[in-house]
Regions:
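Bacterial carbohydrate/catabolite-sensing allosteric modules
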Residues: 1-129
Length: 129
């Protein structure tokens, strides 16, 4: 709700394995009949490519559209505009993954489960902050 994303948020899925990813991203966005208020991307590098594509199409980030990455890469804070991102705690995620793997090895018949871990939203210029 902080971002005002509760209404009008669109989902964009692109086929994986694209040979020319930036061009494919550009072409996918160009076909949108209406643009969402914001994009939340799978990682910061996708978000940075998205910002470039939006700029080429005449959109301004954050004035027209907000963009948020995921993983809070070092590049996110040097990119223009500085990229809002979701910081994941690698040590916690690694510990949790190793724990799940060990449990699965010991008891392979256990049901799969979803695990949630702590993250932090790092607000920067790409969402108007």
């Amino acid at each position: 709700e902080h971002f005002g994303l509760t209404e009008g948020l669109s989902t964009c899925a692109m086929p994986s394995g694209q040979q020319n990813y930036p061009v494919s991203l550009y072409e996918t966005i160009r076909r949108f009949k209406t643009m969402p208020d914001a994009f939340v991307c799978a990682n910061d590098f996708v978000a940075m490519d998205l910002v470039k594509a939006l700029n080429e199409l005449g959109y301004s980030v954050p004035d027209d559209i907000w963009v948020c990455g995921f993983d809070d890469s070092q590049e996110a804070s040097y990119f223009a505009p500085r990229l809002t991102s979701i910081h994941i705690h690698g040590q916690i995620m690694g510990y949790t993954a190793a724990n799940l793997l060990m449990t699965r090895i010991e008891e392979p018949s256990l049901n799969y489960r979803t695990v949630y871990t702590e993250t932090n939203l790092i607000l920067r210029e790409s969402t108007g902050d």
